[in-house]
Amino acid sequence: MFLRQEDFATVVRSTPLVSLDFIVENSRGEFLLGKRTNRPAQGYWFVPGGRVQKDETLEAAFERLTMAELGLRLPITAGQFYGVWQHFYDDNFSGTDFTTHYVVLGFRFRVSEEELLLPDEQHDDYRWLTSDALLASDNVHANSRAYFLAEKRTGVPGL
């Protein structure tokens, strides 16, 4: 269920959003990051993912989002649950007048790069980086780097 922009703004202003993030690994042990074109985290490299819609099961959201973000429809059983995370942003999808709060369910899985059909709606570029390279880059958003930092994983529910 997609909301009108005004209604969605009320939701984002008032409540946390639920989303899925995908920690996608290739056969070389590199991880997929896309350069975000939209707020929040605009201009940063970020793992693929997206919001769960109202009345959408996690299984359906996983399949919809893997198709939308990777061009490859995968069942939720393809992913290893990677914990419950919290993401806080100073801006929102429409500007800087209120913050955004996400409760994020992480899923990690391996894919064959050749199977992916990466879209350009949410990201204007993609890269595969080793965990060391993405941790060393200030252009990778802190919320994505956290998935690879042992001290950030400590105490994360589900890990």
UniProtKB/Swiss-Prot annotation:
Gene3D superfamilies: Nucleoside Triphosphate Pyrophosphohydrolase. Residues 13-153 form the Nudix hydrolase domain. It holds the Pfam family NUDIX. GO terms for molecular function: GDP-glucosidase activity; GDP-mannose mannosyl hydrolase activity; identical protein binding; magnesium ion binding; manganese ion binding; protein homodimerization activity. The record marks H123 as: Critical for catalysis. It catalyses: GDP-alpha-D-mannose + H2O = D-mannose + GDP + H(+). One of its GO terms (biological process) is lipopolysaccharide biosynthetic process. Substrate binds at F2, L3, F8, R36. It comes from the Bacteria. Changing R51Q: Increases Km for GDP-mannose 40-fold. Reduces activity 300-fold. SUPFAM superfamilies: Nudix. Mg(2+) binds at G49, E69, Q122. Keywords: Hydrolase, Lipopolysaccharide biosynthesis, Magnesium, Metal-binding. Its cofactor is Mg(2+). A motif (Nudix box) lies at residues 50-71. Changing H101Q: Increases Km for GDP-mannose 14-fold. Reduces activity 7-fold. InterPro entries: GDPMH (IPR033715), GDPMH_Gmm (IPR028613), NUDIX_hydrolase-like_dom_sf (IPR015797), NUDIX_hydrolase_CS (IPR020084), NUDIX_hydrolase_dom (IPR000086). Optimum pH is 9.3. Binds 1 Mg(2+) ion per subunit. Its EC number is 3.6.1.-. Homodimer. Hydrolyzes both GDP-mannose and GDP-glucose. Could participate in the regulation of cell wall biosynthesis by influencing the concentration of GDP-mannose or GDP-glucose in the cell. Might also be involved in the biosynthesis of the slime polysaccharide colanic acid. Belongs to the Nudix hydrolase family. This is GDP-mannose mannosyl hydrolase. It comes from Escherichia coli (strain K12).
